[in-house]
Amino acid sequence: MTLCKWWRFMSDLDALQSNILADIANASDEAALEAVRVMALGKKGSISALLATLGKMSPDERKTEGAKINLAKDTVTRALAARREVLKALALDARLASETIDVTPPLRETPAEAGRIHPLSQVWDEVTTIFADMGFAVAEGPDIETDDYNFTRLNFPEGHPAREMHDTFYFNPKDDGSRLLLRTHTSPVQVRTMLSQKPPIRVICPGRTYRSDSDQTHTPMFHQVEGLVIDKSSHLGHLKWILHEFCKAFFEVDNVNMRFRPSFFPFTEPSLEVDIQCRRDKHEIRFGEGEDWLEILGCGMVHPNVLKLCGIDPEVYQGFAWGMGIDRITMLKYGIADLRQLFEGDVRWLTHYGFRPLEIPTLAGGLSS
């Protein structure tokens, strides 16, 4: 091959490759890309035609020019494959855009289909809000506690009935002989608070508690809220005012008569149980009137031994505490007869006793219709 023919051949090959690559880049779909492939690499394609001319060349020319043509063929083949992947991705994006599925839940059109807030959740929020308005913080702790925090630091002596296996859920003893248990009250949270904070202290401690008991008014797991105030001047008058204001707000009455009876708890001295005045009308209880009394909580001044065991000097500080069952006051306020119904998960029951998310429950209209 003369120099002139070789130059023309190379110019034609470079121009051909550039044109083919431009056509590949401009192909807008698989069909257009396939047409370019046939035009370039098909049996009658332009590059195939160049390969056919190799037979007319000398062995040396065939070796040299054949390598150049094959290089151009490989370049075009790789460009075709790359463009094909791009077109596949574009096609997939277009299909996904046209087949978009709305995965958000459909709007419930009727109130009957709406979810309900469980009465216990509702009362938990009510209680927390009322005490928060009085300046109380919320303290929480673990459900699994040590015997030390659950009993010993709360002035329970060894051999106290509450420590017995038939009343408390114990875990197997640890290697050092200490025992873990499911807390029987939320008082261990008070212990943790006194050990970690310096007075003054003003907290409530809501949470789950556990005792080995099950009947119409008891379940193995139940909910409590306890309160604790520690400072230098707190006294029973402050405790009575707090409980009186809470009962007025929670039971939605302008006034409620309360009766404080002497009692005994290892962790308070003096200890008191609190009753509120009410009137029973068949299945309804009205608070703030009548001649009946209902026990709702226990309370008292924190025992000096508890303060000592929690690192607080009883010669400087004093305080009071109280505890009530969230399940019990839920039953009293909203007319629930059987405690076990709170935990059975009956959708029909929850539809009646539950609350819609945006409604404000009241004694008069608190229950869902």
From Swiss-Prot:
Matching CDD domains: PheRS_alpha_core
Protein keywords: Aminoacyl-tRNA synthetase, ATP-binding, Cytoplasm, Ligase, Magnesium, Metal-binding, Nucleotide-binding, Protein biosynthesis
Cofactor binding description: Binds 2 magnesium ions per tetramer.
InterPro entries attached to this UniProt entry: aa-tRNA-synth_II, aa-tRNA-synth_II/BPL/LPL, Phe-tRNA-synth_IIc_asu, Phe-tRNA_ligase_II_N, Phe_tRNA_ligase_alpha1_bac, Phenylalanyl-tRNA_Synthase, tRNA-bd_arm
Gene Ontology BP terms: phenylalanyl-tRNA aminoacylation
EC number: 6.1.1.20
Reactions catalysed: tRNA(Phe) + L-phenylalanine + ATP = L-phenylalanyl-tRNA(Phe) + AMP + diphosphate + H(+)
Matching Pfam families: Phe_tRNA-synt_N (PF02912), tRNA-synt_2d (PF01409)
Gene3D superfamilies with a match to the protein in the record: Bira Bifunctional Protein, Domain 2
Compartment list: Cytoplasm
Principal cellular location given in the protein's record: cytoplasm
Listed GO MF terms: ATP binding; magnesium ion binding; phenylalanine-tRNA ligase activity; tRNA binding
GO annotations of cellular component type: cytoplasm
Residues bound to Mg(2+): 269
Cofactor(s) this protein cannot do without: Mg(2+)
Uppermost EC category: ligase
Domain of life: Bacteria
NCBIfam families: pheS
Subunit structure and binding partners: Tetramer of two alpha and two beta subunits.
Similarity remark: Belongs to the class-II aminoacyl-tRNA synthetase family. Phe-tRNA synthetase alpha subunit type 1 subfamily.
The protein's name: Phenylalanine--tRNA ligase alpha subunit
Organism for this UniProt entry: Nitrobacter winogradskyi (strain ATCC 25391 / DSM 10237 / CIP 104748 / NCIMB 11846 / Nb-255)
